[in-house]
């Protein structure tokens, strides 16, 4: 295989982090007060970057969190990159022009596990299909749809133990299921976690307290 040309453009992104006075008062007595503030800012920015990674679709000159609460207009995220640069590996529908994938008896797939197996078989090159680092990144709702029927009933102790084992493993299509913050609730992404990267310029962070 060959490497594709791909350029990157560094643009300024401003992150706002708010801490309530009540929280600051609670932390004020600790010797690591400044470190706590620093860590809170770093965590908030990291979660924002993850939100952009899953939901970002464009780069606006001035973002608007009111109309784009998931930071869709801050930058193009990983999923948007797939849609625009690797559309052949994106499954948006099974029936042409339906705009949806249906799961259940007599529908596109009998269950979500079959969908994941199909994704691996159809969209991932054969030499990567056996990669033991592949995972399924998914939204909370899809995991709930699979596991809620297992736990939402009265069970004998032996069945409870079996249910605990099944739900603790969290697998879809025999791949580990990974829940991450801000992922689209009804979406799936089969990949290696080290495929996901965020690039920023070294020594380019600036912080201003208001």
Predicted features along the sequence, with ranges:
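Long, contiguous amphipathic alpha-helices that act as assembly "spine/axial" helices in icosahedral shell
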Residues: 3-89, 125-143, 177, 210
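Sequence/fold signature of self-assembling virion shell proteins
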Residues: 72-118, 132-135, 141-210
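Generic recognition of flexible, low-complexity loop/linker segments
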Residues: 121-126, 165
């Amino acid at each position: 295989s060959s490497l594709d040309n791909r350029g990157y453009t560094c643009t300024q992104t401003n992150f706002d982090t708010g801490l309530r006075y009540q929280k600051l008062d609670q932390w004020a007595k600790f010797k690591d007060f400044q470190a706590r503030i620093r860590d809170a800012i770093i965590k908030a920015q990291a979660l924002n970057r993850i939100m952009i990674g899953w939901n970002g679709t464009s780069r606006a000159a001035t973002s608007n969190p009111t109309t784009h609460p998931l930071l869709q207009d801050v930058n193009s995220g990983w999923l948007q990159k797939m849609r625009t640069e690797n559309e052949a590996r994106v499954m948006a529908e099974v029936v042409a022009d339906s705009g949806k994938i249906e799961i259940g008896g007599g529908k596109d797939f009998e269950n979500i596990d079959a969908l994941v197996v199909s994704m691996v078989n159809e969209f991932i090159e054969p030499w990567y299909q056996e990669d033991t680092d592949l995972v399924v990144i998914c939204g909370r709702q899809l995991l709930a749809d699979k596991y809620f029927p297992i736990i939402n009933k009265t069970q004998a102790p032996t069945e409870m133990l079996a249910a605990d084992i099944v739900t603790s493993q969290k697998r879809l299509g025999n791949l580990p299921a990974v829940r991450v913050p801000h992922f689209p609730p009804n979406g799936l992404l089969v990949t290696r976690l080290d495929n996901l990267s965020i690039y920023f310029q070294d020594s380019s962070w600036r912080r201003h307290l208001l």
